């Protein structure tokens, strides 16, 4: 597992090593588009998973764009989460049909290290491919946040990546 320079900020890494590590992480993440499906009643789980990566991406000189459906990000929450307040940009009350198009345009520009958008429906293969291509062009990361109700998850089985931890073995 890669440990970021941010996590080791108290260490005495030379600046060039630190910058090389950040560049390696940026290049490895280029073109990454991931969907985060979470329970509506447990949004903290998604935050716990994403915050370390968002903090690391916040070290870049580029913006972080949040395309939120209705809620406005709290200034206090952004600061307490360790995200760079001066690099977080938000567009709220965006209609779901415009979120995908906005994400593609934002990812493609290269102005954002990460673009986070909320979707209510699953993406088609074509939509996902468009996001991945835009993220590669802009050397950016995209996160699709998709809240689901607890009873909706129990009705069907999802295939996906299982992350094993030696904490439980």
Swiss-Prot record:
Up-regulation conditions: By DNA damage, as part of the SOS response.
Annotated site location: Essential for degradation by Lon protease: 169
Region: Lon protease binding, residue numbers: 162-169
Pfam families named among the record's database cross-references: SulA
Keyword Cell division: yes
Source species, domain of life: Bacteria
One biological process term in Gene Ontology: SOS response
Keywords (A to Z) from UniProt: Cell cycle, Cell division, DNA damage, Septation, SOS response
Gene3D superfamilies attached to this UniProt entry: P-loop containing nucleotide triphosphate hydrolases (3.40.50.300)
PTM info: Is rapidly cleaved and degraded by the Lon protease once DNA damage is repaired.
Region listing for FtsZ binding, in residue ranges: 106-112
PANTHER family found in the cross-reference section: BLR3025 PROTEIN-RELATED, CELL DIVISION INHIBITOR SULA
Assembly behavior: Interacts with FtsZ.
Function: Component of the SOS system and an inhibitor of cell division. Accumulation of SulA causes rapid cessation of cell division and the appearance of long, non-septate filaments. In the presence of GTP, binds a polymerization-competent form of FtsZ in a 1:1 ratio, thus inhibiting FtsZ polymerization and therefore preventing it from participating in the assembly of the Z ring. This mechanism prevents the premature segregation of damaged DNA to daughter cells during cell division.
Similarity annotation: Belongs to the SulA family.
Protein name per Swiss-Prot or TrEMBL: Cell division inhibitor SulA
Taxonomic source organism: Salmonella gallinarum (strain 287/91 / NCTC 13346)
